A protein has these predicted regions:
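Terminal, non-catalytic protein-protein interaction segments that mediate quaternary/complex assembly
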Residues: 1-214
């Protein structure tokens, strides 16, 4: 197993460095079950990325002219209710918010009422029966810690689309972190993100190469 460790300044740099690492070190993965079954992707064995200043704007990466943007802030703002509230649109099997909404409130309460030094402020996504869904949640947990009066997040994805998912996911989670920090009364902190399934689908390989080599 090859563990890839990436140090990044902000969300944009994290995305660019992860694209480069996945293109160079990712192995050929033929999908036998799940999204895009029968197709290929490049995937890292396991990766950990430490993002020092995830709140740096813009939260969404800039791409070369002619390359479709992986996300927009308008999309991220529309994504926030999916991340933070239990409301489900018609046809949705789940939202992250249905699992996180009450936990967000409890983590804020916990830190304010009981103090900052606890390892119990962990937010879980999913439940045992989620394994039977057609597409189980990719985000599985957000751990939190307050150190030096800053709220840090530790985020795990079981599978993670680097092109179409990573920028929107982390921009939305960063906005969630800023909201929680404000409610708790501390400063916004750092991020550590990890996955054993960070990947780029074959249809994005050429686009990713343009971005990395610009």
């Amino acid at each position: 197993m090859q563990i890839s460790i990436i140090e990044a300044r902000d969300l944009s740099e994290a995305w660019f460095l992860c694209l480069s690492k996945t293109l160079s070190d990712g192995y050929d993965y033929h999908i036998e079950r799940g999204s895009y079954k029968g197709q290929r992707r490049k995937q890292l064995d396991f990766f950990v990325c430490h993002i020092k200043y995830p709140g740096t704007r813009p939260l969404i990466p800039d791409v070369p002219q002619g390359v479709p943007a992986p996300s927009t802030m308008e999309y991220v703002e529309n994504y926030l209710p999916y991340l933070m509230t239990a409301h489900r649109a018609e046809g949705e099997q789940y939202t992250y918010g249905q699992y996180l909404e009450t936990q967000i409130t409890e983590v804020i309460r916990m830190y304010k009422a009981d103090g900052h030094n606890t390892n119990q402020a962990y937010m879980t996504v999913g439940e045992p029966k989620a394994i039977f869904l057609t597409d189980p949640p990719c985000l599985r947990g957000i751990d939190t810690r307050i150190k030096d009066n800053k709220l840090d997040f530790y985020i795990y994805f079981r599978s993670w689309d680097l092109w179409a998912g990573f920028p929107s996911n982390l921009a939305g989670i960063q906005l969630l972190k800023e909201y929680m920090a404000s409610e708790i009364g501390v400063d916004d902190g750092e991020m550590v993100v990890m996955s054993k399934g960070l990947h780029i689908y074959e249809y994005c390989w050429d686009l990713a190469k343009i971005v990395v080599n610009r």
